[in-house]
Structure formats: structure tokens, C-alpha cells
Amino acid sequence: METMLDRLLTQAGACAWGVADGGAVLAVMPGDARARALEQVPGLKRLLCAAFPYARGDEERGPISLYARGEDYHSVLRRRMEPVQRALEEHFPREIFAFFSDISPFPEVYAAALAGVGKLGENGLLITPTAGSYVFLATLATGAALPVTGDGHIRRCRGCGACKKHCPAG
């Protein structure tokens, strides 16, 4: 299963991916968000989290965030994750695979960190080994018992402060 997922997600353009235990993610969510999540994905067991890098581009083009200069990333991520979702639906025909990116009842950064996709930065963003925090997160929530990739612990950055120093919000 991991080999298939690695192949599919690499083809989709993900720089990192992992699978978090749904119960561990639900445990940190407030009751209303947990209820919404379980309405959308009954029998939730796992969250497949994938990080997709975005171009850093030319920072001299004005005060517009780099990610906002291209096509809407929600559409891009949905398109990139469709082959992954279809393959999983074929492999697990009785299970739901619900796509989320940003607009989600799940704490996606927490889930991705729990899955081992990256470390949690002091700025609250996920920091991946190859793209830093310049990533978009996509999640497939499912009742399928995919193998969990994380060890159940959140890795945090070493506290160098670089993310805070370079944060445009101060």
C-alpha cells in the first residue's frame, strides 16, 4: 500500500505525504468540529495528508503572497489528488474518501505533522524537509484502515525563529 501511495503521490507532485490516525486527530478537536467531521466522513479511521510545494517565484513583484499569483490552489490540489482518490476508491470500494484543502473540519497542519509529513513551526505552519513551509496541504479523510506513517508524536522545529523573523505579519 505504501509503495502504491508513494508512486501516486509522487506523480501528483507531492513533496511529502503521510497517514495520520483519525482517532488521534479527532481527540484534539472541539466537539462541534468533531461532529461535523464525522458527519462528512462517517467511520473515519485515517487522514492521508499530502504536501505540495508552490513556486517561490520573484519576490520583487509587489506585496502579493507568492501562492496568490497563480491558479487557485484549491482547484490545483483537487485536480492533483483526483487520481490518488480514484485509485484508493478502486482499492477500497466500500470506503469513503473525502477531499479537503483548507476548508475542512480537520486541523490539517496538526494531522500532517502527526502523519510525519513535516514539523510544526513556531509560526503554526508545517515545515517540510524539502520545501519548508512553502506548501499547500491536501487531505483525503477515509474509513479505510490505511497504514499509519507517523509515530503518534508531533515533531516541532528547533526554535531558530527564522519563520517569525520573515513573517510578513510580524
Each model region followed by its residue ranges:
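Iron-sulfur cluster-binding cysteine motifs and their immediate structural context
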Residues: 162-170
